């Protein structure tokens, strides 16, 4: 079935591809749009913007979220900003520079055409959000302000203090609410998609569980859009919201949609370190802090020991005895290297014994120099809410002492394979935002997730989905009484009944923690062949334990969070195995995927472009069967492929 990997990338010059492609897409006239139904799964920035835009175009949209309100989507937690090539700072930014730095940051493992389109529409996103009333930070004269993020040598990140995701989501939520009031969008809060329904090989609906009543419901449509985010919670401890999950995308994979580059997971360098065995999630400290914060560890082991024993404070260590290791190793970018580079550097220092907390798994993020240069008031203006959050969690005042940080799982670059139209290998099934694989390659640049979600939802999907729906408006509304719906619902009920009947000895959280330990130990920041094989073996054993000895309390026909978690863990166990399998197959180091066997003498990533310059798209072949690998070659016609260099 390799012929399914047709990317549909348009011919012609890079800068003209998207414009030319739009002109060649089929469209649906307003009268026919009213006959068509679209299901959108997820109400984060991608889902909310897509549902609002599609509703405004006149389609009948059903939008589903697992929370009480779309405002609870995890997009709201994004802190630092959103990238766009506006060149407001007059620092020589451009669409091409954003495109190039995104490709380079992803270690040359993403499609040129998709990334250029993302950079091309980025400016429109800012205009759209300003029109919605998003309160971006402004300079004294009223111009929108920018700051820098990792992997960029210009300032292109627009922000609303440390609450950018919240403000962008409120803008998208307002647009969504307007369409709900108009009647073009119907919202289904507290509903979780448990399966996608295919009729004649095309996506025609979903099976969902009402999380309040436990009722299993059927919903039909002419197309389905997956905007449910990534699968970072496979690791148990991550910066994601605790109910974030990859289940919707995973059900699509098991129905025939290919899953691409699952091993590409991003580990964020600035998170509050783990503090105990009973911790349920981790807290991100925005990358924006690296604009003014300097990362360091002591140079002397004796100072490290004294810090751990509480004999000295960080401020007692003299400037000449501090190792600002990112500034030392990467002088051209300093503390603003890409996330994968900064995370590995922190791990290297801690592995060498220079970690500064009692566990040895922390480094300092210090604002003393910035406070001396700018003053406390300016730092408070830029980062006040982030400093307040840090102090509440750690009881340490970051205005007076350095923050302690350590890398943690944050984002997944892998996801459902999609073509240039954002359609998966299943006709009528689309994936946007973090749910797809398309734009970030092996590593996402900071502030680009919000950019992709809104680009897909506002400015790409509303054009491309019409090309498919132009063939569907003559078809009647999907009959949810069709045998395919009956069969899908029956399978969902059987899975739930099986989980409820086990009555074993282990809670879902116990088993999820075990999975998280396996993933972090063997499929984390550093991977090797023996460890990945061990991970696959351990995950398979754990999956057997889960299906034979898990205990799911409560009633299936009612509100039951244990059942919700069990259904998601069943998927995480399978996702984790595919991640390990993909990482084992990809015998190179690129971006967030670091194989210890493939590194340079100074510990940097070492790609193998001859053998792995492709998207790895995996096809599900059945339970307990190995998936089949399909390859989409990556061609670079506008960028010269090179080893990433952030040193000069």
Task: Label every model-predicted segment.
Residues 102-146:
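Rossmann-like flavin
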Residues 67-100, 266-270, 277-281:
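Conserved N-terminal glycine-rich FAD pyrophosphate-binding loop of Rossmann-like flavoproteins
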Residues 223-278, 282, 440-463:
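Glycine-rich loop(s) and the adjacent beta-strand/alpha-helix scaffold that form part
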Residues 128-215, 220, 227, 271-285:
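Conserved redox-cofactor binding core of oxidoreductases
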Residues 251, 257-392, 463-466:
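An anion/pyrophosphate-binding glycine-rich loop and adjacent beta-alpha core
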Residues 34-36, 214-223, 425:
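Core beta-strand elements of the Rossmann-like FAD/NAD(P) dinucleotide-binding domain
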Residues 7, 20, 25-28, 32-37, ...:
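Glycine- and aromatic-enriched mobile tails/lids
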Residues 42-45:
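Glycine-rich Rossmann-fold phosphate-binding loop(s) that bind the pyrophosphate
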